[in-house]
């Protein structure tokens, strides 16, 4: 198991926790002095009250919580939000309200998930052409939306 250093910047901060035994993401809670109202089609920056020190070669991703998205149309506009290994500031979550009603965030509300993952650094080798493939430049829905297409692999 990977050990990650964490500092509680606010004594009221709730540290990230896995809600279930096999959860991939840890729930991240809002650390607020007063409620925050996210109006329809607006954003709010929500503090977590903690900072982390990731080992080199890792990142943390902040992702939306499915229940907030399903029931309230609350998401993260920059999902997944990346926390780099050299960032030492407070973890903050940008929430966006895609719904038609104001959404109130209270202290302790679980507003995002955080997944820690290994990151591979790459070196780009500039060439004049790329190898051909059966897909070529097909993208943006080129396989359609109906049914479950049979794999051609």
Curated annotation (Swiss-Prot):
Its cofactor is Mg(2+). PANTHER family: DEOXYURIDINE 5'-TRIPHOSPHATE NUCLEOTIDOHYDROLASE (PTHR11241:SF0). It is an enzyme of class 3 (hydrolase). GO terms for biological process: dUMP biosynthetic process; dUTP catabolic process. This enzyme is involved in nucleotide metabolism: it produces dUMP, the immediate precursor of thymidine nucleotides and it decreases the intracellular concentration of dUTP so that uracil cannot be incorporated into DNA. Pfam families: dUTPase. GO terms for molecular function: dUTP diphosphatase activity; magnesium ion binding. Keywords: Hydrolase, Magnesium, Metal-binding, Nucleotide metabolism. Belongs to the dUTPase family. It comes from the Bacteria. It catalyses: dUTP + H2O = dUMP + diphosphate + H(+). This is Deoxyuridine 5'-triphosphate nucleotidohydrolase. InterPro entries: dUTPase, dUTPase-like, dUTPase-like_sf, dUTPase_trimeric. CDD domains: trimeric_dUTPase. Substrate binds at residues 65-67, 78, 82-84, 92. Pathway: Pyrimidine metabolism; dUMP biosynthesis; dUMP from dCTP (dUTP route): step 2/2. It comes from Chlorobium phaeobacteroides (strain DSM 266 / SMG 266 / 2430). Its EC number is 3.6.1.23. NCBIfam families: dut, PRK00601.1.
């Amino acid at each position: 198991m990977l050990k990650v250093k964490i500092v509680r910047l606010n004594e009221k901060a709730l540290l990230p926790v896995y809600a279930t035994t096999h959860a991939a993401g840890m729930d991240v809670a809002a650390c607020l002095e007063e409620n925050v109202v996210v109006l329809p089609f607006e954003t709010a920056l929500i503090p977590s009250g903690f900072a982390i020190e990731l080992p080199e070669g890792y990142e943390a991703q902040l992702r939306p919580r499915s229940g907030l998205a399903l029931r309230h149309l609350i998401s993260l506009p920059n999902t997944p939000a990346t926390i780099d290994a050299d960032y030492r500031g407070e973890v903050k979550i940008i929430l966006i309200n895609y719904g038609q009603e104001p959404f109130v965030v209270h202290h302790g509300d679980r507003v995002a998930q955080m997944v820690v993952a290994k990151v591979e650094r790459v070196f780009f080798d500039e060439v004049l052409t790329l190898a051909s493939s059966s897909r070529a430049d097909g993208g943006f829905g080129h396989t359609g939306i109906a049914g479950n297409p049979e794999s051609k692999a």
